[in-house]
Regions:
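Flexible secondary-structure boundary motifs
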Residues: 1-51, 77
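Short aromatic/hydrophobic-glycine micro-motifs
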Residues: 9, 218-219
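Polyanionic, low-complexity intrinsically disordered segments
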Residues: 34-159, 163-172, 176-188, 192-202, ...
């Protein structure tokens, strides 16, 4: 491909499903240029994963459209990060920061599979300074949140074993406790985080990590009181 051969940019084939993207493209061509009718070109280019017959009318439903958007988004993001890392090596900190932001934004819209794949991409990056270590730490937290949302407990357990919060600030200890379903001392850590301005009521009501405690009515009430009293 042009990216791999001319630009030496990896297509991240282990994370991006290029066969799906090819099928998305060819289906679009059919709809726009061939009255949605399946032809030989579509079948030969896509290997016909849906077993359509020549002459059959092709459609796009809501689920298909959303899945296509997610795959295009993932592919675009990872290619962008690869280009950034190869062409602007002096600003790797900024690229890593953007990875963290994108995983957080995907968590907010419940795009958990994209979060996990983007985080797996970040695992290929070796931190070279304290700031990069901090960002990668946050990315790993986002990965753990996505795994917990998907109830992938086996992968979640592996991820949590690689997260060390011994000397971390209260907000990260809170996240680690929540991800481990450990609520002992959680309110005390919230009080510390509030004092340090690491969290406020708006963050608590917005951030995906706190979905897991907001679902617990008693604990949620106690935490709301904690914000009122501190």
């Amino acid at each position: 491909s042009h990216f791999e051969e001319k630009l030496t940019i990896s297509l991240e084939r282990d994370l991006i499903n290029w066969d799906k993207i090819i099928e998305f493209r060819e289906r679009r061509h059919l709809i726009v240029h061939n009255s949605s009718i399946v032809n030989k070109k579509y079948i030969s280019r896509t290997k016909n994963p849906f077993n359509f017959k020549i002459g059959e009318i092709i459609h796009i439903d809501n689920t298909y459209f959303i899945n296509a958007l997610k795959e295009f988004k993932l592919g675009g993001q990872l290619l962008l990060f690869n280009c950034w890392g190869n062409w602007d090596k002096e600003n790797i900190d900024s690229a890593l920061y953007e990875i963290m932001i994108q995983t957080f934004e995907d968590l907010k819209v419940k795009n958990y599979e994209t979060v996990i794949k983007t985080c797996k991409y970040s695992e290929k990056i070796t931190a070279r300074n304290e700031q990069q270590e901090d960002i990668i730490f946050r990315v790993n937290i986002n990965k753990a949140i996505a795994l917990k949302k998907l109830k992938n407990n086996a992968e979640l357990s592996k991820t949590l074993k690689n997260i060390q919060v011994g000397t971390a600030s209260p907000i990260f200890k809170i996240a680690f406790q929540i991800l481990n379903d450990n609520h002992n001392g959680l309110i005390d850590n919230f009080k510390k985080a509030i004092i340090l301005d690491e969290i406020n009521i708006d963050y608590y009501l917005e951030w995906p990590i706190f979905d897991f405690v907001r679902e617990n009515e008693e604990l949620h009430f106690q935490l709301l009181q904690t914000f009122k009293n501190n």
